[in-house]
């Protein structure tokens, strides 16, 4: 069987590379209201650095709104772009706020907890008929994440997480991400295609449904600047 660090390394490696993704973001309130955004996502991940650019394609009243996120060794940084308004930097204290006011935070989108050095296997559990290994990841320093630990339920056959739970320093469960659909990418590797996110807001739930992924793309640093999204 794989050790915790081997499992984390394998998941870290499988997330590396560049991709252009089309995704539907749906935020549902418990009262029944629903908000839907069609997104284009540019993603570039290396062993040490993550760059993301989320851009709203639809509906028209939000078209062109974008969020750019970057994380290297230290804390994550980001920019919020709204047409006809000045570009706004995301403060460190705002990294736990919702991406496009969803239940997924900026930090969740950009951080790669499989690359953290502290990894431990703490048990196993079956999720939706899949026998999973539970991996517990802790950040290298408190500045690297808004979370104190992350638990992920890994399918050891396909090397995809089926569930992710993120905890605060007081041990409170802050966010839970369930993978509801696993698809195959262009290289026939399994990837999480649809996610359901429960966050600190108790009155809403967010779903991401990936529609398309193109991995035959190469981005430059300029692709992750406001000029490229406006």
Model regions and ranges:
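Short, ordered beta-strand-loop transition motifs
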Residues: 44-50, 123-131, 185-187
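An acidic-aromatic
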Residues: 44-104
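Charged, amphipathic alpha-helical segments
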Residues: 2-9, 37, 62-66, 133, ...
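Extracytoplasmic
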Residues: 16-20, 36, 49-51, 75, ...
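N-terminal leader/targeting segments and the immediate start of mature chains
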Residues: 1-34, 40-49
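Gly/Pro-enriched, hydrophobic low-complexity segments
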Residues: 79, 88-89, 99, 104-108, ...
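Generic short beta-strand segments
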Residues: 22-28, 57, 136-140
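Hydrophobic/aromatic beta-strand elements that line small-molecule binding cavities or substrate pockets
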Residues: 9-11, 37-44, 66-70, 123, ...
């Amino acid at each position: 069987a794989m050790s915790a660090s081997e499992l984390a390394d394998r998941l870290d490696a499988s997330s590396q590379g560049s991709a252009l993704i089309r995704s539907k973001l749906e935020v549902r309130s418990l009262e029944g209201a629903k908000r839907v955004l069609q997104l284009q996502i540019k993603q570039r991940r290396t062993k040490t650095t993550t760059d993301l650019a989320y851009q709203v394609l639809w509906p028209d009243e939000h078209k062109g709104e974008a969020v750019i996120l970057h994380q290297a060794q230290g804390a994550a940084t980001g920019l919020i772009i709204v047409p006809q308004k000045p570009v706004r930097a995301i403060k460190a204290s705002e990294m736990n706020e919702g991406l496009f006011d969803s239940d997924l935070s900026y930090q969740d989108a950009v951080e790669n907890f499989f690359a953290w050095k502290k990894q431990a296997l703490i048990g196993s559990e079956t999720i939706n008929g899949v026998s999973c290994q539970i991996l517990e990841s802790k950040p290298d320093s408190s500045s690297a994440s808004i979370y104190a630990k992350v638990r992920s339920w890994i399918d050891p056959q396909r090397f995809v997480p089926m569930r992710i739970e993120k905890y605060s320093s007081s041990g409170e469960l802050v966010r839970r991400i369930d993978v509801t659909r696993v698809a195959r990418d262009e290289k026939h590797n399994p990837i999480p295609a649809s996610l359901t996110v429960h966050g600190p807001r108790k009155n809403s739930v967010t779903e991401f449904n990936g529609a398309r992924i193109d991995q035959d793309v190469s981005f430059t640093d300029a692709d992750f600047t406001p000029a490229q999204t406006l």
